[in-house]
């Protein structure tokens, strides 16, 4: 893991802590945090209280960021302005990594939302895929693609990918199929392939201009399976 990479590239005189932490089980998360923090002289009571506050803050953040995206959608539709759902990994929020791509899209007159709009949305199902959904961020990107596919032509899907990141190798095919079955294009931006955003800007501008020429959606296709 990352902790091993960091530890092997630093001076052995610098200690690196890498406790095992899970976020899948609240009880286990609390236990792991209290055990680790106890080594720093923090009491079990304070540690448990801190975890409780942190979980509440995370829940509030998820709600706030989803509500913000929903407000952007409502306001954009009121003004009849186009929207792009820009999906990616957590590290794509770093302007240096994404080359300020979201700002560039906004400068083209398109409002930008993220895949956070489907956070905690249990109404969206992604059963029509061949993937085993075991990664949280991958699942959210799939849900975001499914949500976009159900929307009008005013909302389009653009995905950033970098370094051939792990599950992207097969995730991209599934996202493409979801969108194409619903008559929508899939725009993929490999942002680690460029040093400037000129080519990326051209791709996005082409998408925006094509939407002006083809405002109607295609016909939705059924999910295809084959007996084995």
Tell me what each language-model feature is.
Residues 1-228:
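An N-terminal assembly and electron-transfer interface module characteristic of large anaerobic redox
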């Amino acid at each position: 893991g990352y902790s091993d990479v960091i530890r092997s590239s630093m001076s052995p005189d610098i200690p690196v802590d890498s406790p095992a932490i899970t976020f899948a089980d609240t009880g286990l998360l609390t236990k792991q945090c209290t055990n680790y923090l106890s080594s720093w002289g923090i009491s079990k009571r304070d540690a448990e209280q801190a975890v409780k506050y942190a979980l509440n803050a995370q829940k509030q953040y998820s709600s706030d960021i989803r509500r913000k995206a929903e407000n952007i959608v409502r306001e954009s539709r009121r003004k009849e302005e186009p929207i792009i759902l820009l999906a990616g990994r957590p590290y794509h929020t770093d302007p240096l990594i994404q080359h300020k791509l979201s700002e560039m899209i906004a400068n083209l007159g398109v409002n930008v939302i993220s895949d956070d709009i489907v956070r905690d949305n249990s109404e969206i199902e992604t059963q029509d895929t061949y993937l085993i959904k075991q990664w949280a961020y991958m699942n959210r990107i799939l849900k975001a693609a499914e949500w976009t596919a159900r929307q009008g032509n005013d909302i389009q899907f653009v995905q950033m990918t970098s370094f051939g990141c792990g599950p992207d190798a097969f995730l991209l095919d599934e996202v493409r199929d979801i969108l194409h079955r619903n008559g929508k294009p899939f725009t993929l931006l490999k942002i680690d392939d460029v040093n400037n955003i000129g080519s990326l800007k051209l791709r996005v501008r082409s998408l925006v201009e094509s939407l002006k020429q083809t405002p109607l959606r295609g016909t939705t296709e059924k999910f295809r399976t084959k007996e084995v």
